[in-house]
Amino acid sequence: MVTLSFFDVFLRVYAIINSHARVRQILVKGSDGLVTAQAPGKLYIAGEYAVVETGYPAVIVALNQFVTVTVTKAEGIGRINSKQYQENSLTWQRNGDEMVFDNRDNPFHYILSAIRCTEMYARELGRNLSVYTMDIDSDLDANDGKKYGLGSSAAVTVATVKALDQFYDLHMTKAQLYKLAAIAHLDIQGNGSLGDIAASVYGGWIAYRSFDKAWLAAERREHGLSELLSMDWPQLSIELLQAPKDMQLLIGWTGSPASTSRLVDKIAIAQAKERVEYQTFLSASKNTLEGLIEGFRQQSLSAIQAGIRANRQLLNHLATLTGVEIETPILKQMCDLAELAGGAAKSSVLAAVIVALR
């Protein structure tokens, strides 16, 4: 029997997550207008490709590594700073309700989209907009800016919305926060399930089904944000799960993060040519994920491990069907070693491998 020393093959182990992990909330809005908000990164446990389709389930876990956004009231000129992009700090001013930037060539697209959507919502609620300095720090990217593939763009979107929610006293519920952050993120990425947004908002383990994005696009042409945030979104489902107490989750990183949006695009192009086979994959994924989710509900580690193994097989079939490499050689090696040690393992969007152990 291989001992747990096999995990030395992992280039990086991020976390051992207990089933009670939750989003760290902020705390107090100071008299100087300072607000700090945090949102965690995420990892898809299973269902990461099928969940892009409306109503198909995935299991996602929020991590104990965070993006932190701090907003401080300023006079005249505001700034947006990030430790990951120190050379690209933005300065801005107000022209009425508009933000006017000194330069537009910047890496802050998700942050700016989150600001735009949250301030649009704030204006609908009658709030007066202010000038402020925003500082961003992240545990989810390396110091050189390399992404670990843990949902940093979603986390920074959520943390920005949360901070401005506090700053403008908007009192959003988690459901409203999810919907507003999802809109802001979708405006930039253009595709995806938005499950990473849900994980960053709710924390812990969740079972997630995506909403109908065509419905949302149509409704946005007819309704403002305050109305959209109060609506029931078709097919959207977010269920909090509890992991068995005897289960450990280990996460290994290959050192080669993947672009989620590009992978989704490649899968979409390929599945258009293989419609029947792709529908078969979706049906099998749904059945597998429903069994996996029931394993969490019943606190059955064996059922969870069986679901992870079945999902790995489905992803390998999807790779054959589409020609998209999902389980790279190093990921295969990591998964196989995990199985030898008594765990259940699969890849997660090329960048990491997850292992469920007793």
Where are the regions a protein language model picked out?
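A sequence/structural signal of beta-propeller blade repeats
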Residues: K174-A175
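Short, positively charged and aromatic/hydrophobic N-terminal segments
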Residues: F10-R12, I16
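Extreme N-terminal basic, low-complexity initiation segments
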Residues: V2-S5
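Short glycine/threonine-rich catalytic loop with a Thr-x-Gly-x-Asp
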Residues: L150-G151, A344-A351
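C-terminal nucleotide
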Residues: A21-R22, V28-A46, A50-V52, I60-E124, ...
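DPxDG-like acidic metal-binding loop motif
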Residues: Y148-L170, G204
